[in-house]
Amino acid sequence: TCAFDIIGAKFVREVENGEIVYIENDELKSIKPFPPKKVRPCVFEFIYFSRPDSILNGKTAYEYRKNFGAQLADEDNIDADLVVPVPDSGNAAALGYAEKKGLKFDLGLIRNHYVGRTFIEPSQQIRSLGVKLKLNPNISVIKDKRIILVDDSLVRGTTSSKIVKMLYDSGAKEVHVRIASPEIKFPDFYGVDTPTKKELLAANKSTDEICEFIKAKSLKFLSLNGLYLGMGFDKRNDNYPQSVSYTHLRAHETRSD
């Protein structure tokens, strides 16, 4: 909905599932010609994709992400000096975490806004270079601090491992990684670029193994229940929109290879 602000339009409401909205004789009208279906929104819109100032189900994406950070703080008991976001995707969650814990929030990483998203780049080499180009450590903030590093999600681990090393190289005493969403263990066939299960770190490693892989002092993901609480959604909404057969999964992985 942030696009409406740019062009000076007024946001009235969201178009509902299966709804047709049209204008007739300068009057806004709506019909629902299809049988009602259970709402099954893409959770990644709330976690990552939507711009923070866009509205989803009556709240901004920013509000949801702050909620995720606060829920994660409720589930955590680590002691640290500072909460640092992975900019810009982790900003809202890190702020929610810091406010809930009563910890200092600071910008330990400075982002170059002329570099795009790294986890959706096509090759590992390009993704690794993208992290170095996109983020630079703010040494005056980081040095000699026990840091809680908050990000919105962990997909391949590309960004997290590079950032953890960057923080330690800049003098951080400890780096505790906190992810404001649950583990991503399965591919999505509706737009998220996670082609195969083998590319998803959480599909192939335990939390302890991922922590060792990214070289963090500790690692924690938001629980599924924490995600539901942060969204204000019923847990029964979490089924995939349609069944995906094992044959389809295997064919998809073969094509990706």
Predicted regions and their residues:
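N-terminal segments that mediate ammonia production and transfer
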Residues: T1-G90, A98-I139, I147, F233-D238, ...
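Active-site phosphate/pyrophosphate- and oxyanion-stabilizing loops and adjacent acidic/basic residues
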Residues: A70, L95, D208
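Short, well-ordered alpha-helices that flank and scaffold nucleotide-derived cofactor binding pockets
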Residues: D74, L95, E99, K165, ...
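Short acidic/polar active-site loop segments enriched in Thr and Asp
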Residues: D81, K173, K217
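Gly/Ser/Thr-rich loops at beta-strand to alpha-helix junctions
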Residues: P87-A93, R156-T158
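PRPP/pyrophosphate-binding module of the type I phosphoribosyltransferase fold
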Residues: G130-A203, T207, F213, S256
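Conserved small/polar residues in nucleotide/adenosyl-binding loops
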Residues: T247-T254
